[in-house]
From Swiss-Prot:
Stated name of the protein: Telomere repeat-binding protein 5
Superkingdom of the organism of origin: Eukaryota
GO cellular component: a single term: nucleus
Binding partners and assembly: Homodimer.
Deletion phenotype: No visible phenotype, probably due to redundancy.
Location of the protein in the cell: Nucleus
Keywords: DNA-binding, Nucleus, Transcription, Transcription regulation
Residue ranges of coiled coil: none
DNA-binding region: 551-578
Biological role stated in the UniProt entry: Binds specifically to the plant telomeric double-stranded DNA sequences. At least 6 repeats of telomeric sequences are required for binding.
Species, as recorded: Arabidopsis thaliana (Mouse-ear cress)
Compositionally biased tracts (Polar residues): 309-325
Amino acid sequence: MVLQKRPDYGFNGYEVPHTPRAARSPRKSAFKKKSENHQISSFDLLAAVAGKLLLEGGNSSSSSNNTSGNNEDQCAVKKEPLNGGDIMVEEETTNSDHDNNNAERSFFVSEILQKSHEMQSFNRSPSPLKEFHFGSSSGITSDSSEKFETQELAYDESKINNGDCYRSESNDKKSMLGGLNFEAKLSRNVVGKDEKHIGSGFRKPIPQNPSTCSDDVDLHGKENDDGENFSACYRTKSFRSTLRIGDRRIRKVWASKYCKVPPKLKDTTVTNSDLDLKSDYYSKKHCLKSLRSERNYPIKKRRYFDGYTASQSEETNKNEGQSGSPRKASAFLSSIACQKQPAAFQSPRDSNNVKLGIKSFRVPELFIEIPETATVGSLKRTVLEAVTSILGGGLRIGVLVHGKKVRDDSKMLLQTGLSLDTLSDTLGFCLEPNPPQSTKPLSPEDSDFARPCNVPHTLTRCLPSPGKHAKPSNSVESDLDSKPSAPNRGKTIYSRALIPVSPLHAQALTVVPPRKTKRSEVAQRRIRRPFSVAEVEALVQAVERLGTGRWRDVKLRAFDNAKHRTYVDLKDKWKTLVHTARISPQQRRGEPVPQELLDRVLTAHAYWSQQQGKHQLLEGPQQLETSLGL
């Protein structure tokens, strides 16, 4: 028996209610699975049973006539062997006075199959099974839970035309609300006869082999005019009930560690009304949505492996999140280049070591005093001796952390806040002269003027202290209370010579004195340096010879060796002397100047003032003639 599918499921008079669709993810799997291991479905089983029963037409027709006019509730069970197995068909009928109420029919078939492949071949073979008949008696369960008696199965003529089901309605009875659904379920346990009460729904048996009951059979029928016979139509249900789907769909969606798998639906009460189906389905649908929305999936934590292993990452976590990525920082003058090697390439012993590379240091400023009578060669030798004394062991290292000097050399790096993640701008170094060997002003007696010029002078190499960062620092502080630090053990020293100089002769060495900043020059100018009596006498003598209008010549003649005296200073001093000579002695301030020098100042000032006036009178007509071209 082959059924043809139509968009309306092959029925003209009755339309199947709208099927609620499940979530997207359960729809990915097929609703039906083909029976495996040669197991037939319930529809094929019913077709085979109907074919066997149609062969005995006499018995079925007689039983149909007997049950048509009988008003009593009857139930009969016919049992026939089929291919070595027993098949028992039971139908329960209940007559109720309420014709307008909905009725539910249950049709139970239990079977024990031994040769299922023979049943499949029997179903697919061409046979006169296209027309088969059922009687008007059916298994109907009412809501009133009335007792019922047995009634024999009867078969009557019915036709199936391309899957269409049709029959006439009686004039004295109203059409039933909803279709009469006969759901055939296969079970290996035979339904007993002694069941007398069935509620509004039937208790659905859970088959032991789900593949044998994958299809449902619906029997839609309406009474004829005589109220005796009706036509039946078998078809495969286009959808499964919610609870049948629950074993596959709902359990599939609930299969997570946050959702508990529901128990097997053995004692679940099922109603066949469309309203109950929709409400039951949508209630579970919303429940599933709420469960899915409340899932708290664990956040996947990304691990960034930046050149270190898991064991080393634990060590870095203990050291307050020390990173293993390489960092480079370089600066000039008083800066360093800090290169942190990746921890993956270091041994566990050296994983917490801080390796630094100091590129340069700033030499402290040198202050040297030398008399005016010293020669250039003596000046060179003096500067060379000062530099040699500093670089030869007169320096010490000062450590600055965040601009503050660390005076205790016995502290650990972690105690001072220095670790692998320390930035290069938090640490600084400075070169300081040792207190006992600090540079002192050199006098002519201290300088060795008698040293021959061919004596070689070499500069020693000073190795900076490794193991720390450096920061530019302009301040030079004395570290008097610092303690000697213990030498580093097992650490490689990365250092360069500060000034690697080969042995040279003093004559070939040109030492440029450190250039003083503009600020220092301004500070030296602001220092008040009064003229002495000798300097005043030298100034008066030079002005008497050269005049008051030649201050540059006066500077070169009288104050050539005095670098701190400029020609502007000489001019200002001359004006001050003229003003001092003109006022009374009681009004004068500063160092007293002899009256004889003041008289000479007035005489020289009056003379050069007259000479300057005469020179202007003589040069005036000559410049006018030259400008006019005469």
